[in-house]
Amino acid sequence: MVRSGKNGDLHLKQIAYYKRTGEYHPTTLPSERRGIRRAAKKFVFKEKKLFYVGKDRKQNRLVIVSEEEKKKVLRECHENDSGAHHGISRTLTLVESNYYWTSVTNDVKQWVYACQHCQVAKNTVIVAPKQHLLKVENPWSLVTVDLMGPFHTSNRSHVYAVIMTDLFTKWIVILPLCDVSASEVSKAIINIFFLYGPPQKIIMDQRDEFIQQINIELYRLFGIKQIVISHTSGSVNPTESTPNTIKAFLSKHCADHPNNWDDHLSAVSFAFNVTHLEPTKNTPYFQMFSRNPYMPETSDSLHEVDGDNTSMFAKILDAIKEADKIMENKTTSLGQMENNNLDELNKSKIIVKKKPKQLNPFHLKVGHEVLRQRKNWWKDGRFQSEWVGPCVIDYITESGCAVLRDNTGVRLKRPIKMSHLKPYIRESSEQESLYLLQGSVVADHDYIGLPEIPVGAYQANILVEDATIGIVDNELLTSSKDRELLEYRNTKVSPLIDDHSSLEKQTFSLLDSSNQVLEYLS
């Protein structure tokens, strides 16, 4: 370690001097000698050059001292052979893999920050060109090319098929191929050019090298440049390609006729062009030529060939119509299944009506005794909630929270939500103690807002009213349990009434004696 404020180059010179001579450099302070000895263990001399090997002695990094050598190393590690510039992390990795000096990290950062080329490249934003979808506005202006196969080798040695689809009319042309080389595909495309003319663009879902070879062949054969583009260029909507129905039917037809499937490709394409309806309810033939083809009035002429034999085109036409019906039914059934599934999901959904949040569910008011909920209380190894109290509601804030006081009358620091409170219901034993402890009753219930009346009169009124209510209710009670409860209550109340009557008698006797004394004095 280099002490704070010490020059790193001087530190390395002192280590090199110590490793070479075994003595300390004249500039070495006595307090630095121990550090020089410990640091020297990580360096070795090789061919009169100092190398840093580290604690494990597995590294082999040349020690750089002079500023010129540092700049040379930084320039070599920051720029690669291709002329590109590395960032801080990569440059630091390259420097530390072969070279060593004490301030290597800071020097690399300053070098990269000061590099003019890096600053210009950092502030330059490369905006990718926007890819615009080609608009299909006219027939035979934008065509897709798909390759299918390999199929069973036909009698004419055809193994593959090429399908050209016009994206505007959905007109298709199918031709057989012996292989899928660029020259073979280009010859098939040229034959279609001679029938319908070249389109504006041809889209293929192939690799760029193959597309470039086809463009070269088309330029050699037809003299047109860069007409074929890649499907991945984003110039066309992926859904606007060869319909899957055609591919599926062609695969099945080639499997059913392994030897002569290539003889029927023109019939298959014509059958699709005259029957395959588009969303506009017009056939591709009508879209292409603005008219319908001439077809026999009855289908009998198509089916009756040499008596009982049926023409191949009629078979293909019927098969395509059947495939369209199957596809339509499948689409309809899938739509119905989706609708049924949605209906079942809607029926199975349980509509849970959330109760509105009640800010004061118990209709608590100022002066009520309540228990407050204490949540997240750690007890018995887990968090629990419990009700503590009782407390008294001192007042209610504007936000609907209650400020409480405990039994000692001390106000709690934080307001409590009304939803975290519930009424405190006293037990029977506590109610009896309230009747007996009259002074404490008044002290505890002074906050309720009762009128200030003498203790004896207030308590006597309560007891007398309770006793009269019990007597009246006794006439109405018929069940044995109610009578037992009333008798128990009367037994508890009657001694208190007697005590209260004796107390009143003593009070009146004291008043009489005081009157007599006043008369005597007068």
Swiss-Prot record:
Record keywords: Phosphoprotein
Keyword Phosphoprotein among record annotations: yes
Chain segments annotated as transmembrane: none
Gene Ontology biological process terms in this record: DNA integration
Chain positions with Phosphoserine modification: 502
Start and end residues of each Integrase catalytic domain: 135-292
Pfam families: Integrase_H2C2
GO molecular function, one term: nucleic acid binding
Signal peptide: none
Superkingdom classification of source: Eukaryota
PANTHER family reported in the protein's UniProt record: PROTEIN CBG26694, PROTEIN NYNRIN-LIKE
Protein name (Swiss-Prot/TrEMBL): Gypsy retrotransposon integrase-like protein 1
Organism: Pongo abelii (Sumatran orangutan)
